[in-house]
Design a protein with these regions (language model features):
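Alpha/beta-hydrolase active-site loop
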Residues: 116-137
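Gly/Ala-rich beta-loop-alpha elbow adjacent to hydrolase catalytic centers
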Residues: 140-149
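Catalytic histidine-centered segment of alpha/beta-hydrolase-like enzymes
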Residues: 259-269
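Short alpha-helix in the alpha/beta-hydrolase fold that links the catalytic acid
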Residues: 236-244
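Short beta-strand/loop motif that positions the catalytic acidic residue
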Residues: 219-221, 226-228, 232
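An N-terminal hydrophobic leader/cap segment in hydrolases
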Residues: 1-55
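Conserved alpha/beta-hydrolase
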Residues: 84, 91-113
């Protein structure tokens, strides 16, 4: 039995007599987020072009990145166990079109050390980036970064257009993958939920609804383009279908095949759709 399986077995056993302790131990493992992903070799040239600065947010010195001359900023929000350089192929396209991409390494990711942050930390970071760079011509979010992007726009961040790639719709998805990896049983998952509620949200049990991208998504007033692969093994395609239904007529969903969770970032057709939409073209119907 490997370490992950042993850890899950131990947490499941502990959750019966001591759910609070099991939940707290699981939370501490969850918040680590895994090892920092290095910049991929094929992305190093784009990464090296960025102006790198830091933002002091909570306990973190957050690494931020900006490309271009500052005109027409486009915010890029990466996903779980990722980093800003994930967007390198899109950054190249946007620079060629005269846009100025802006991004950051989330807490516990990339060059930003420490533990992982929450949706509230992401909102603060995005707000500071808007203060520095101005209204965004577009916001592009991938995976968990898509959920963070929707929440930020609901909370008053200004942007003209929104692109959501392999999007997380339900906030509970932030722990679902972790729980599945450790094979946590329902009692241990419930203990983890409670520990997260207490540690980050003052015991508020409504966060799983309030911070879901589907919550009040109908209040979004900007055009939205969603792209999601039907074979995504990490975030089911159904998550984007749910988000599409919640947003309503301002949104369109493009379903790809064979790209899985990360292939959209380098797929030429997907990049064409994204950049055309950012430039003001109507969202494609399929």
């Amino acid at each position: 039995m490997n370490t992950i399986a042993l850890t899950g077995t131990a947490l499941n056993a502990l959750a019966l007599p001591a759910p609070a302790l099991a939940g707290e131990l699981a939370r501490r493992l969850w918040v680590r987020g895994g090892p920092a992903r290095p910049v991929a070799d094929q992305d190093r040239d784009v990464h090296a072009l960025a102006r790198v600065e830091t933002l002091h947010v909570g306990e973190w010195e957050v690494a931020t990145y900006a490309w271009g001359d500052g005109a027409r900023p486009v915010l890029l929000a990466h996903g779980w166990r990722s980093r800003a350089s994930w967007f390198a192929p899109l950054v190249r396209r946007l620079l060629d079109l005269g846009y100025s991409p802006v991004s950051w390494d989330a807490p516990g990711h990339g060059a930003t050390g420490g533990r992982s942050g929450t949706v509230l930390d992401a909102l603060e970071i995005i707000g500071l980036l808007q203060s520095r760079h101005g209204r965004f011509n577009a916001v592009v979010g991938h995976s968990l970064g898509a959920l963070f992007s929707v929440h930020a726009l609901r909370e008053g961040i200004d942007a003209d257009r929104l692109v959501l790639l392999s999007s997380v719709a339900d906030f509970e998805t932030v722990i679902a993958g972790f729980a599945a990896e450790l094979r946590l049983r329902p009692r241990a998952v419930a203990a983890l939920r409670t520990a997260i509620e207490r540690r980050y949200f003052g015991g508020d049990t409504t966060v799983w609804t309030r911070f879901s991208a589907t919550h009040d998504a109908h209040t979004l007033t900007l055009p939205v383009l969603l792209l999601h692969d039907r074979e995504d093994p990490m975030i089911p395609h159904a998550q984007s279908r749910r988000l599409l239904a919640a947003i309503g007529e301002r949104a369109r969903l493009v379903t790809t095949s064979g790209l899985r969770h990360n292939g959209i970032r380098t797929d030429a057709d997907s990049l064409d759709r994204i950049t055309a939409f950012v430039q003001g073209a109507p969202a494609p119907l399929s």
